[in-house]
């Protein structure tokens, strides 16, 4: 029996022992060393050969990732680690650090209970470190810290033991400041990364060594020894004395929770159902014999097996051949194969129980974030939808070069939308021109070149990237009448800006899109009031959609309840295209103040009510001082001081605003905010301006008003592009 086969047998046994399972992720800023760390953990556990680790990047098993040298999709693997004479099952997920792939990070966080946050000793805490930490804490995932690339502080920056400790303390303090700011109230103190108890490790993933304070005490290695090993180029010996996988996995087992502990506080956070119900209690207890409840965290497309769903189970168990029910898509499915992940391979097992991460085939309609349960005990409601900190901000139009490829292209686009819910796909079968919206240039490039070109074998023409704008209002409209085509139904409404605190709660995911078919639910009302909406309005909200809401302030109109669903549909159609450039509207509250309907139901059907509301909403928005909003990115540039002026000039030339500047040694850090529309070609330009000596990163920072002097020009460009008549 080979080493891997033994490992599989051990995994099967340990899957049933909850206190010996750790579901953990590795997350960090791009290039801080996540995948190298993952590989060396796998090598230490005997999953891949030690010689290949680091170069092999076992988790970067997609050709595109290997070519770019960055992790694009989150990969999963299960392995066994022995600690204090006991064996533990570690389910490990490696997540991408590149800002364009933030969606994968969000989805991975739903599957795990703890995370090793990797931070580069040279660069320190970077914007993406903060973003992944925010995602983790929002999902109640407990963090521990690994400070990587310590050898560079010694060999390149020549730091003394005192300076080394100073640098570590600064990074730890910054991470703890973020944890204090963003952690759930009850964990603000408990979850701080404390060096003494061993919640922080230091080392070099590339050279395969790490230490922590408890490990130093056990092994007698000091900071001075580490400096000697690095300076004398004996990091191999150091790796024998302080192996990376032992230190990191010991830290994970000691400080990260097992599924039993974690589900007690994670379930109420991600599931809003009745905690006293059978299934509620079963999930909190992580009961393998309870009703089935799980969430799909990722869809992986395998050339042979088709769509594979990575799934975290919170309750019950899945066996091969079980009938399943997908709550979001309201579809039945069957578990054709049940397996565990071993990097790029999957190993079939007879069944998987609560607290584990597994691979399922047969869920054809599943999307990332889908709730899985049994058809005999449907989980109502499903799990909270996955909210991302970024939004798609760039769109490209693509067309198949060959018309015969059209049906296949449409199929692939639908598949991409299922796999990655940060991609928006609009399929236009009439014109053959399809729109893909993504998080940034790289995200779009990977979709068009890799997913469509390489995997799908379809040649496509890709249009120029288009920036996604939004529209909102700055004033209140007069009372507007929306009339049905037959003139027998009239609805009166006012458009006004949504309360700032309520819109902020929407952006943070505290309130979300929802139609209240009969009346506002108690839970929905409570959340709206908490967000700052007046109680009287909160209990009259009919629908929240794309960051807009409609509130029914009428009284005693009998037919209104019958027409409620049609009014909601008309409202949605009304805010899909704004008056300035037919871009989506956000941040608008429509107050319905009066209505008259024809007595005869035949004369107040969908063909009458929907257009009446749609025209009314559009007219009200047009008369409430509409403005264009453009997507912004926070841009961080880390550059030698000699090039600081060039870096700032590059930002200023792109309508950017410098928000903050810091000096650190001979490096300058420039923090700025730049419109996405001005960011095309930035990578090449900033490298040229600083002769390739700078590090830079961007992340989406929301929408802001387009400067008044530019608005007419931009609106005209968008209208011309869409073939709309100029206003």
Curated annotation (Swiss-Prot):
Pfam family, one: EFG_III
Cellular component, GO annotation: cytosol; ribonucleoprotein complex
tr-type G domain ranges (all copies): 19-260
Entry-linked SUPFAM superfamilies: EF-G C-terminal domain-like (SSF54980), P-loop containing nucleoside triphosphate hydrolases (SSF52540), Ribosomal protein S5 domain 2-like (SSF54211), Translation proteins (SSF50447)
Signal sequence interval, chain numbering: none
GO molecular function: GTP binding; GTPase activity; translation elongation factor activity
Cited SMART domains: EFG_C, EFG_IV
Protein keywords: Cytoplasm, Elongation factor, GTP-binding, Nucleotide-binding, Protein biosynthesis
Presence of the UniProt keyword tRNA processing in the record: no
Binding positions (GTP): 28-35, 94-98, 148-151
Lineage top rank: taxon: Archaea
Subcellular location(s) per record: Cytoplasm
Modified residues (Diphthamide): 603
Biological role: Catalyzes the GTP-dependent ribosomal translocation step during translation elongation. During this step, the ribosome changes from the pre-translocational (PRE) to the post-translocational (POST) state as the newly formed A-site-bound peptidyl-tRNA and P-site-bound deacylated tRNA move to the P and E sites, respectively. Catalyzes the coordinated movement of the two tRNA molecules, the mRNA and conformational changes in the ribosome.
This protein's name: Elongation factor 2
Species annotation: Methanococcus maripaludis (strain C6 / ATCC BAA-1332)
